[in-house]
Amino acid sequence: MFSSITLRQLKNSPISTLKHTRNFASTMEGFKELNVTMPKPFVYKVELNRPKKLNALNRAIWFEIGKCFDILATKDDCRSIVLTGAGKIFSAGIDLPDMIALGGKLAEHEDVARKCKILEQTLKDYQDHFTALERCPKPVIAAVHSACIGGALDLILAADIRMCSSDAWFQVKEAEIGMAADMGTLQRLPRAIGNQSLVNELCLTSRKIEPTEAKDCGLVSKVFDTRDSLVAGALEMAEQIASKSPVAVQLTKRTLVHARNNSTQTGLDFIRYWNMAMLQSEDFINAAMAQATKSPPPAFAKL
């Protein structure tokens, strides 16, 4: 495969170590309920920013989440994303006053068909905003401290990697407030932990999941002692991902997401057709040659 590549070509190729920039910081403006920053090169941090309301998920923050991740999906200076929460807890879940306001909107109509149409479109919009994390080709790492309740669990289940601090706890809250979870938990939790009996128990009883159990069952992959070490660890992993070829990383995520809902053969077809193009990328050639010659990892062009 490499016979046509000479050492001179290798020498002239853009192989160099990705430099870590100290005190690197940038902010993406235009959001009220989110704090979006770029603490490291190619790494964005999206922070739920309603600490006085325990980061409860109201209509505004829901829509901002969808908008933010759709924007980051297209930014060539974004290669990985860390999702956190400001304040005492990650998120208390659905903002109940917001739900009550929706009830008032439904009360304006007497006909059940018209009420159903409003509610169906609202739920569809909300689902789409959370699915933006999964739809985004850049890997998303959810870093959870303290409480992650109801709709917040729906949110992090759309992330690619989940980790938490030792004070974290998770709860499928919806059954306790008289509803079934409708933003992704019932669809994504079974795939995340792979134990249908445990999924049924958690969703039907609404009991809390502590960090040790969360790691043991696969809900999270890492548990950190403190919130600070959690965020630092998440950013370190995001930086590691960002140092890889964006061509490779983004196609890997797309293929993993595709594989969840398709057969093995369909998944093999999917990656084969994609790699017909991607294996011709300079990223593959440069990364492979760096490995073969034991050179430092290359710096990759924006994508």
Residue spans for each PLM region:
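Conserved CoA-thioester-binding segment of acyl-CoA-metabolizing enzymes
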Residues: F2-A86
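C-terminal long alpha-helix characteristic of the crotonase
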Residues: K40, M163-A168, V220-D269, A277-Q280, ...
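Terminal peptide-recognition signature
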Residues: V46, R50, E64-I65, L83, ...
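Short loop-to-helix capping motifs
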Residues: R50-P51, K244-S245, S281, K294
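Charged catalytic carboxylate motif
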Residues: A60-E64, D125, A132, G233, ...
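Glycine- (often His-adjacent) and acidic-residue-rich active-site loop
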Residues: D77, G85-H129, G178
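Short, active-site-adjacent cap segments at secondary-structure transitions
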Residues: K88-A92, I149-G150, P298
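Crotonase-fold acyl-CoA enzyme core
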Residues: T131-P246
